[in-house]
C-alpha cells in the first residue's frame, strides 16, 4: 500500500519580509517563490508482514523574487509572456517552486484568472509541483492599529486546487533542532565566492578533504587519552569513597565514646548527690520537738553532713508514730535469711523470759517490804501498778505467745 503527502515549510523571516514589503506598497503585489522539493519514502512493516510505503514531499521555501507591478509577465486573460518571464527568472528558473500574490481585503479563494495563470506557468516551467501562496491582509479595527494577515498554500491535484499544510519555522520550534539532510539550493553569491577561494586549502580536486588520515590519527590519540583519564578518575573516586567510609566510621566511634562519657558523668553525679535520712529526721522531730540542737543539721544515710540549717520539711510518712530501730540484715553477711529469722525469734523469747523474771522479783520485793502505814502501802501498791505496763493476765498471755510490746528504742 502506497500513499503520498505534501507539506510546505516557510521560514519566519521570509514571511516577515513579504508582509513588510506588502505593507509598504499602495497596491497588490506578486512574485515567485524559490526553494527545493524533497521526497522521503517511509516503509512501515506491520504484524501481518505487509509493507506500508508512504512518500512524503516537503517543499522548502527559502527565498522569493518580487515583481514591482502587476501583469508584468502575463496579460488579463492569464497568458504568459515568455520574454518577460525569462527576464525575471534568468538564472533561477530551476529553483522556482511556486508563485505568490498579496491581495488586500479579499477572501482566501483563488480567482479564475489565477487558476489559468497557474496552469500556464506549469507548462512554461515544466514543473507540475508548482504551488500558489495567497496572502490576504486586512484591518480589523477602526483606528487601523491592528492588522490581520491570513495565508494559504494551494496545489493542484487531479484538476482541483487543494490547500496543503504550511509550517512557519520559528526559532522555538522543535522541528528545527535536527540536522538537515541536504544543503539549501539557494546559496548566496558571496558564500560561493568565499568557499571557492579557500576550498583548495581543504579539499582535493575530487572534492575529498585533505589530511583526513591525520585527523583520524589525532582522533584515535584523543580517545586513548580520554580512556586513561577515565581510569584515573575511577581510581580517585574509589579512594574518595573509601575515605568517606572511614570518616563516617570514625564519627560513629566518636559519637559512641561521647555518649559513654556523658552516661558515666551522669551516673557519677547521681552517686555524689547525698540522700537525706528522712526516717532519722522525722524521729528526732517527733520525740525531741524542743531540742534545736538535734534539728540543726541533716545527716545522710552515709553519715555525711548535708547542710548546717535546720530541716523544716514535713516528710509525708504514714508510720511516723511507730518509728523503731531498723536493723539491716546486710550488716551480717555471714548470716543467711533463715538463720537471721531464727536468731530474731530466739532473741524475742529470751527477752520475754528475762522481763518476766525481773517483774516477778520486783513484785516479790514490794510484798516483803514492811509497810510504815496503810497510806504508804496503798501508795506503794498504786505506784507498782502504774510502773508496771502489763497486768498479770497480759504477762501470762505474752509469755504464752512469745511476743513483747513494741516501743521506740534508740
UniProtKB/Swiss-Prot annotation:
Gene Ontology annotations for the cellular component aspect, listed alphabetically: BRCA1-A complex; nucleus
Residues in coiled coil: 208-261
Positions bearing Phosphothreonine: 391
CDD domains in UniProt: Abraxas_1
One Pfam family it belongs to: MPN_2A_DUB_like
Bias kind Polar residues: ranges: 368-389
GO molecular function: microtubule binding; polyubiquitin modification-dependent protein binding
Motif (pSXXF motif): 407-410
Modified residues (Phosphoserine): 48, 387-388, 407
Disordered as annotated region, ranges: 354-410
GO term, biological process aspect, one: chromatin organization
Processing after translation: Phosphorylation of Ser-407 of the pSXXF motif by ATM or ATR constitutes a specific recognition motif for the BRCT domain of BRCA1.
Occurrences of domain MPN (ranges): 7-160
Alphabetically ordered keywords of this record: Chromatin regulator, Coiled coil, DNA damage, DNA repair, Nucleus, Phosphoprotein
Subcellular location: Nucleus
Protein family membership: Belongs to the FAM175 family. Abraxas subfamily.
Subunit details: Component of the ARISC complex, at least composed of UIMC1/RAP80, ABRAXAS1, BRCC3/BRCC36, BABAM2 and BABAM1/NBA1. Component of the BRCA1-A complex, at least composed of the BRCA1, BARD1, UIMC1/RAP80, ABRAXAS1, BRCC3/BRCC36, BABAM2 and BABAM1/NBA1. In the complex, interacts directly with UIMC1/RAP80, BRCC3/BRCC36 and BABAM2. Homodimer. Interacts directly (when phosphorylated at Ser-407) with BRCA1. The phosphorylated homodimer can interact directly with two BRCA1 chains, giving rise to a heterotetramer. Binds polyubiquitin.
Function: Involved in DNA damage response and double-strand break (DSB) repair. Component of the BRCA1-A complex, acting as a central scaffold protein that assembles the various components of the complex and mediates the recruitment of BRCA1. The BRCA1-A complex specifically recognizes 'Lys-63'-linked ubiquitinated histones H2A and H2AX at DNA lesion sites, leading to target the BRCA1-BARD1 heterodimer to sites of DNA damage at DSBs. This complex also possesses deubiquitinase activity that specifically removes 'Lys-63'-linked ubiquitin on histones H2A and H2AX.
Protein name, entry field: BRCA1-A complex subunit Abraxas 1
Primary gene name: ABRAXAS1
